[in-house]
Amino acid sequence: MVARFIFLSFIMLVGTLAPAKAQNSFPYPALPDSLRSVEQRAAYLSEHYWDNFNFSDTLELANKEMAEQGFVNFIDILARFDQEIAQKGIAAFTAKAYQQKPSKEKFESLIEHYYENPESPMRNDRVYALFLEDMAKSPYFDETEKERIGFKLKQARKNLPGTQATNISFMLEDGKPHQLSDYREKKVILYFYDPDCENCHKISAWLDKQTIPAGISLLRIVADNRLSTIYGLKAMPTIYLLDKENKVILKDCTPEQLMEALRGNENRK
């Protein structure tokens, strides 16, 4: 897996880089001196990130340190922005990336790998949906491709943060039927798992050792085919955090992200 940059260090580092590119490094844009804050620099970078990358150069496309590492850093940045800024960055990227077949195939493959691979730490359906929306509108994809993209977009949009979680019926360890809508007035952790998944049991044991604040319901739900389809589950386990109205706070998060969010909530009290 290609390495992720630490966000703040990355933004400050880019500000010191010249646009000239080394043989094996991504050609980051020079940031205007007038941009003083991290937020301003980051917003500019998202929109101008690909200005110096030559999408028609097959050597650059094949260079993992340039094309793939550059893409990983790009999507890491996008995940930290609101919808409007992320959309602008993606629009600037897609306006160039899909014009020629080698570039289109390269980046379509990277998008699929980093957003659909269950092992990818970069999975983020909010940002993935923005890429898919742009691909669905692009003149560089034919109708057959757009039909496939449309299906993926429908899956990615399921239960995004800020939306109402789909109500489901399920069985818990008590053997009784439950409805998600029954769990109101408390935050809810949905822990979808496969009983035969070794990693599920490891993460479940890890969670048992953590301090989950009082007033939060942890629901361990066996992910059968029906639930996997409804929630578009890609990996086991899959963890959601819902608010007291069953609105999604975190979707498909790591155990560490879950505990960080719970600790942050406790600190705000």
Describe the residue ranges of each PLM region.
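Typically the conserved alpha-helix immediately C-terminal to a functionally engaged Cys/Sec
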Residues: N199-I212, P255
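Thiol-based oxidoreductase modules, predominantly thioredoxin-like and allied folds used
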Residues: A214-R226
